[in-house]
Regions:
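Recognition helix of helix-turn-helix/homeodomain-like DNA-binding domains
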Residues: 31-45
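DNA major-groove recognition helix of helix-turn-helix/homeodomain DNA-binding modules
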Residues: 49-64
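Short, charged recognition helix plus adjacent turn
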Residues: 66-82
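Short basic helix-loop element that most often maps to the first helix and adjoining turn
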Residues: 9-27
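DNA major-groove recognition helix of helix-turn-helix
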Residues: 14, 40, 58, 69
Length: 82
């Protein structure tokens, strides 16, 4: 069975958007600075609503902020090159 993990690119996006502070992002997303800190440290998985709010602040898709990664090895038996 495949398992997945979600990471985030919030810190990089803040830097790319004029070195936006955690406080500014928090205010624009309607959360506390502590929430942004927890998200950046991958200690908290946001609700779908919060994920959309953060994506809108940066004018990107949710997946650009929170990419989904497969924790299972790619490929498998019988998928090797010919």
């Amino acid at each position: 069975m495949m398992t997945y993990s979600i990471t985030n690119r919030i810190r990089r996006l803040r830097f790319d958007h004029g070195e936006m502070t955690q406080q500014t992002l928090a205010e624009q997303a309607g959360v506390t600075r502590q929430t942004i800190i927890a998200l950046e440290a991958n200690k908290y998985v946001p609700s779908l609503l919060l994920a959309y709010r953060i994506a809108r602040v940066f004018d990107v898709t949710v997946e650009e902020v929170f990419p989904l990664h497969s924790d299972s090895p790619e490929g498998g038996a019988g998928e090797a090159g010919a």
